[in-house]
Amino acid sequence: VRCPSCGARNRIPADRWGDERAVCGRCKSPMRPTVLFPERSVPISDSTFAGEVLAFEGPVLVEFFSPRCGHCIRLAPVLEELASEYAGRVKFVTLDIERNQAIASRENVNGTPTLFLYKRGKLVDRVVGALPKQELARHLDGIAA
């Protein structure tokens, strides 16, 4: 697992994953699950996509959105609720496709909202449209396990 402070790779055994005392071996920063998997969505860009998503070893939900999209605006609070509920297990990130067109184009994102679910840097699920919270939770349960 990469340290969010210095980027060093750390090994955390599965039985110690939730241990609040876990620290980075290099910089001694906390390696708590809520530090690695925050309770809120993290905005990313074309330049940070690889590091925040592809290099991240845990599950990640990427929301491709447009600030002018009505469905995206209605989905945002649902995703924030889910980010809080899945804190420590799934990392939530958002990518504004109007400002970051390279990744959206490369990933063939044709409409918004589009959600990609990654695990260990690999795309494992894709959801197009604003689904109900319970359905999104079902998709998240599949990658959080």
Where are these regions (language model features)?
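Glycine-rich phosphate-binding loop
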Residues: G111
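Proteins that catalyze or organize thiol-disulfide redox chemistry
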Residues: V1-V90, R99-A102, R106, T114, ...
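Conserved residues in the N-terminal Rossmann fold of short-chain dehydrogenase/reductase
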Residues: T94
